[in-house]
Amino acid sequence: MRLKHLALGLAVATALPVAAVTAYAEEGIYIPLFTYRTGPFAGSGIPIANGMADYLNMLNERDGGIGGVKLIVEECETGYDTKKGVECYDAVKGKNPAVVNPYSTGITLQLIPKAAVDKIPILSMAYGLSASADGNLFPWIFNPPATYWDGASAFIRHVADVEGGFDKIKGKKIGLVHLDAPYGKEPIPLLQALAQDYGFELKLYPVPAPQMQNQSSLWLDIRRDKPDWIYLQGWGAMNPTAVKEAAKIGFPMSRMVGVWWSGNDDDARPAGPEAKGYSSLDLNAVGTDFPVIQDILKYVVDKGKSQITSKDKVGENFYNRAIWNSVLIAEAIRNAQKITGKKVVSGDDVRRGFEALDITPARMKELGMEGFAAPVKLSCADHNGHGGISLVEWDGTKWNTKVPSIQPIKDKVLPLINSTAEEYVKANTGWPKRTEPCDKSS
C-alpha cells in the first residue's frame, strides 16, 4: 500500500498508483476514509482504519475492484477532532467521492447539512444522529444497522430480561457513563423517555475528554450512588479506563454493559481477569473463521499490503466491525452500478444504491460472511434497518456470544426518531424537502 501526504498533511493510502486529483473520477471509484491512527482515540481508531481499508483493498486485489472498476481508497487523519474532520471533508469533496465515512458523531453532525448540497452520501454506521434514520427527511444520511437509540433500548430490554420483566425494573437505578461529547450524549433522550415509561431512575456520569484516563473520582461517585446497572457509552482510552475503575470499586461486571463502540478487545484486555463478565452490545461476529477474512489474509495481509502491525489483530471485534462497514459501502456501490448502468458511479448514484440495500442471509453467504452479522434492509424511508443486536461477554481473554439477538424496543424508538427528525428540520430554516428518486431494493 503506497502512502502519500496531501497539502493538509493527511495520510493517504491508495489502492492504485497515485493519480492526479482531476483524474480520480475517470480512473476509479473514490472512497475516502476518515480515520484516527493518532491521539487518545487511536486505540479504537486503528483497528477500524485497518479493517475498512483491508476489505476494500482485498476487493481490488481479488476482483479488480467492483464491477470491473478499481477502488481508490484514501485515508484522511482526523484525530477524532471535529474541525479536522470538516477539513478532511473539504479536501475530498471535489474528488467525486462515492461516500464519506466520518467515523465520528461530532464530524457527522457537521456534515449532515452539507451532504444534500454537495450530493455526497454520508455513511455513519451505527453512530451519528439517531434521527437521521428517517430517510424522508435525511435522504443523504445512512446509519445502519442500528441507531444509538436502538442500542440503548436493547440494553434496557436486556436489563428487563435479567430482572424478570419490564415491571421489575421500576425503582431500579441505572447509570449512563458517557463521553461528554455529542457521541456520548446521543442515548440520553431515549433513556430519559424509557425511564419515564418504565419507572427506573437514570443517573448520568459524563466523562470529559481530558479526564478519560483519570476517572477515579467519577467511579467513587458511582460507588456512593450504588446503581443497579451501568451502560457505558465510551470511546478510545475512556473504555479500558472505565472497565478497570469499575473492577477497582468492585462493581459487578455482569451488570455493566457497553454500547457496541465499548467492545473492542483492547477495551477489556487491559483489566485482565478482573474484566471477566463485562458485556458489550455487538453488531458483528469476531474471529477469522469466515471465507471473507481468509481472503483478506490471503490477498492483503499476507502480501504486506495492510497497515496492521500484528496478524493476531485480524478477527478482533473492531477490525471485523470495520469490514462490515466496508461491505455496506461495496454493496451500495454494486447496487448503484445495477440501478444506473454505469461502471464509475457518483455519490448521487451511491445514495440510490444505499436506499436499495437488501443484504439477505443468502447474500451474506455469497460474500463469505454467513453468520457474520444480521441481515440489513434499507428503504427510502428507513435508512437504518433497526436490526437485531447481539450481546457478547468477555471471558478474560476473548469475547463470546452471550445473547445472540436482542431486538430494539421499536415502539419506543421509532416515534422518537420521527419526532426528533421533524424537530431538527424545523430548527434548520430552509431545510430542503426531499426530491430525490426512490428505487426498489436490490
Q: What is the role of each PLM region?
A:
Residues 92-105, 123-125, 173-178, 226-236, ...:
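Periplasmic-binding protein-like
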Residues 305-319, 330-404, 408:
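Segments of small-molecule ligand-sensing domains
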Residues 78, 122-124, 129-133, 210, ...:
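Venus flytrap/periplasmic-binding-protein-like
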Residues 28-53, 76-83, 104, 177-186, ...:
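Extracytoplasmic "Venus flytrap"
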Residues 130-131, 139-249, 287-294:
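Extracellular/periplasmic Venus flytrap/periplasmic-binding protein
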Residues 1-23:
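Gram-negative bacterial Sec-dependent N-terminal signal peptides
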Residues 28-30, 43-50, 62-135, 144, ...:
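Beta-alpha junction/loop-to-helix N-cap segments that form part of ligand/metal-binding clefts
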Residues 246-325, 405, 420:
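Extracellular/periplasmic periplasmic-binding protein-like sensory domains
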